[in-house]
UniProtKB/Swiss-Prot annotation:
Pfam families: GST_C (PF00043), GST_N (PF02798)
Domain GST N-terminal stretches: 1-80
Protein name as catalogued: Glutathione S-transferase 1, isoform C
Record GO terms (molecular function): DDT-dehydrochlorinase activity; glutathione transferase activity
Chain's gene name: GstD1
Residues that bind glutathione: S9, H50, C51, I52, E64, S65, R66
Biological source species: Anopheles gambiae
Record keyword Transferase present: yes
Membership in a protein family: Belongs to the GST superfamily. Theta family.
Subunit architecture: Homodimer.
Keywords per UniProt: Lyase, Transferase
Amino acid sequence: MDFYYLPGSAPCRAVQMTAAAVGVELNLKLTDLMKGEHMKPEFLKINPQHCIPTLVDNGFALWESRAICTYLAEKYGKDDKLYPKDPQKRAVVNQRMYFDMGTLYQRFADYYYPQIFAKQPANPENEQKMKDAVGFLNSFLDGHKYVAGDSLTIADLSILATISTYDVAGFDLAKYQHVAAWYENIRKEAPGAAINQAGIEEFKKYFEK
């Protein structure tokens, strides 16, 4: 199973943790966006959207990390704990995944990426939106050990990849009691946690320049 990725990428790390959780071995194919490797004709044949992560499972190509995570959990999961079959439980997992994609991760990117990649000054409005997003997550976790209920799901893995990226960026998670407690636990409990840690160390370099 080929996996086109960058180790520092939060979406890529989410997939790697999910693969670890279901016991799938990935054939890692480092894809350097800075060198334009995602624009090579052979990669465009696989993924015309030319983005990572991209998974190829016996000829079946899929991209968008959360779609890949649900695919791996459904096809290779030994049970439905990671991605429950119960419609309401699954709906909550989906909501958290979409929240991560559209709000939590997106607002991190909106605030930090212009500073990192375009050397622009910090935008206070985007900073507040980012803080609001972590506040929403804090509310979700009030009274719960995991982000989508009472057991670890792929939503925890996806959001761990994002929140650990917040952490290495220097965002103060201590102000969000439930997020901080969840993060302290999940970074030890999550399958593939060591892979995630190695990846965020790679991403951390962007904040040391």
